[in-house]
Amino acid sequence: MITTLRRSTIALLASSLLLTIGRGATLPFMTIYLTRRFQLEVDVIGYALSLALVVGVLFSMGFGILADRFDKKRYMVWSVLVFILGFSAIPLVNNAPLVVIFFALINCAYSVFSTVLKAWFADRLTAEKKARIFSLNYTILNIGWTVGPPIGTLLVMHSINLPFWLAAACAAFPLVFIQLFLQRDGGAAAQPGAAPWSPSVLLRDRALLWFTCSGLLASSVGGAFASCLSQYVLVVASSDFAEKVVAVVLPVNAAVVVALQYAVGRRLSARNIRPLMTFGTVCFVIGLVGFMFSGASLWAWGISAAIFTLGEVIYAPGEYMLIDHIAPPGMKASYFSAQSLGWLGAAFNPMLTGLILTHLPHWSLFVILIVAIVAAWLMIFRGINARPWQPDSPLANA
């Protein structure tokens, strides 16, 4: 990569790291925060968090699609500003609905930043570099998840509000990085070989439909598993043990990703994506079975999380590369925004988890998640078969 492109890439990777440290210090503890400060029941918390996540995903999709028409640097700056506003406001309000509203703003801002970041990489990097940089970005994000939760745990011991101030402070640095090191662009129209911008194309692409539906189910399993597990443990044990489980599971998850993500992700290709996604599905299933029988053993929770994370290590770059493979030039952000609808699965997870834990046997939660990830795997194959798949395409050489 040329020097300017390398500098911009490093600035964006550093921004991802800092934003994720802030999220890692706060997001896993939202359930505990709402329980302690507002004495909400677990099913009510599920509804509240799901509503915030759904609103965030839907608004971020609209903003993300428009990012193909406008300057991506400006989009990133505004999303980080909203991120800071949301985290600064939560400790200052004493009203649960307002907390949910600001939480929705935070999720919208982060989703927009993430979508535009992926589109920025897809527009500017060669096919060989895309898989490597995305896997490196995902590794860096999980370094943030490794650092964030322990810091959040320490801060919560002193004050339930401190993690939110940390998140706001961490987000201030990306503002500087983006302003100094990112160049403005002219939107999709300025890109050579760009397809005419037409959001209606998204509605006609059957492969995109299958991949988005698959992402919906997969994110319902892996996208919010920390809050899902904390809800589960709150019901079967206590809030104190829930804190311990979150403090074990998230660092284990992040450590496995940091160790394996780059090595595995850079080797994904159109030739081997089918067997690798199958292996990832098996890892998800084994991890979920492990969670079901972990009980009071933190060791069992940690081992199950490690196996579960092997599935995540494969699915994360795999889903990105599937979308990049089918997205035409000039519409990368639009396609990634459509894919972000899949995160509605993670958004609905807290609500569905609350309903399941309230009305069904506790162990049935993991059985339902197993069925969901198997269905997601089947939909990936339907999407691949929806259009001619070229093993020798750029994806194969990534």
Can you describe what each PLM-predicted range is?
Residues 74-89, 275-290:
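Structural signature of the two symmetry-related core transmembrane helices
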Residues 163-179, 366-382:
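Symmetry-related core transmembrane helices of the 12-TM Major Facilitator Superfamily/SLC fold
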Residues 53-61, 145-146, 254-262, 346-351:
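Residue-level signature of mid-helix packing/kink "hotspots" within the transmembrane helices
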Residues 104-141:
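Cytoplasmic helix-loop-helix junction between adjacent transmembrane helices
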Residues 59-71, 260-273, 357:
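Helix-to-loop junctions at the C-terminal end of transmembrane segments
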Residues 1-6, 184-213, 398:
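Juxtamembrane intracellular "pre-TM" segments in multi-pass secondary transporters
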Residues 29-43, 227-246:
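Short amphipathic helix-loop junctions that connect adjacent transmembrane helices
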Residues 330-359:
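A late C-terminal transmembrane helix in Major Facilitator Superfamily
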